[in-house]
C-alpha cells in the first residue's frame, strides 16, 4: 500500500469555519480517519454518532459526509493511492470498511500517523520503504485492540 496524502491532528474550530466534508461520490481514494472528537458521520446512507477516539476506513467510492458534533472537529487522515490499495490484506486482518469503530485510545495510532507524515513528505533516503513498514504497523495496531 502507498500513501497518496496524509495529515496529522487537523483541527477545525466550528466558531471560525463551517467544517463539513460532503463527498456524495466518495472520497476518491481509500481514506483512513482517526477521529479525535465527537462527530456525525453518514457513510453509504447510514448515519452514525461517532465517539472521540474512533477510526473509520472508507472505500474510495462510498458516499460520505462528516462534521463536528460539538464545537471542534479533529482528526488524522490518510488517503491511499488507488493503484496500490491492498483490499485482501485489510479483509484478512478483519478491519471493517465504511463503519466507524471505537477504539478507546488512539494515542499510539496518532503518533504513528505523525511519524508517517514526516516520512511521507521528507524525501529522505529509504523513506518509501520505511513508510511501507509503518503502514503495515498502522493496520496491525487496530486489530490488537
Where are these regions (language model features)?
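Amphipathic alpha-helical recognition patches that constitute DNA-binding helices
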Residues: 31, 108, 130
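Residues embedded in well-ordered beta-strands
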Residues: 31-33, 77, 137
Amino acid at each position: 500500500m502507498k500513501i497518496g496524502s496524509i495529515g496529522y491532528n487537523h483541527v477545525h474550530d466550528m466558531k471560525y469555519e463551517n467544517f463539513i466534508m460532503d463527498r456524495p461520490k466518495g472520497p476518491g481514494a481509500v481514506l483512513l480517519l482517526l477521529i479525535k472528537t465527537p462527530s456525525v458521520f453518514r457513510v453509504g446512507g447510514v448515519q452514525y454518532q461517532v465517539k472521540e477516539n474512533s477510526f473509520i476506513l472508507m472505500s474510495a467510492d462510498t458516499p460520505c459526509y462528516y462534521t463536528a458534533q460539538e464545537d471542534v472537529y479533529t482528526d488524522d487522515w490518510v488517503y491511499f493511492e488507488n493503484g496500490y490499495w491492498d483490499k485482501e490484506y485489510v479483509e484478512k486482518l478483519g478491519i471493517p470498511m465504511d463503519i466507524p469503530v471505537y477504539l478507546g485510545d488512539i494515542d499510539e495510532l496518532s503518533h504513528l500517523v505523525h511519524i508517517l507524515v514526516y516520512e511521507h513528505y521528507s524525501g529522505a533516503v529509504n523513506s518509501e520503504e520505511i513508510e511501507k513498514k509503518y503502514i503495515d504497523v498502522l493496520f496491525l495496531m487496530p486489530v490488537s485492540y
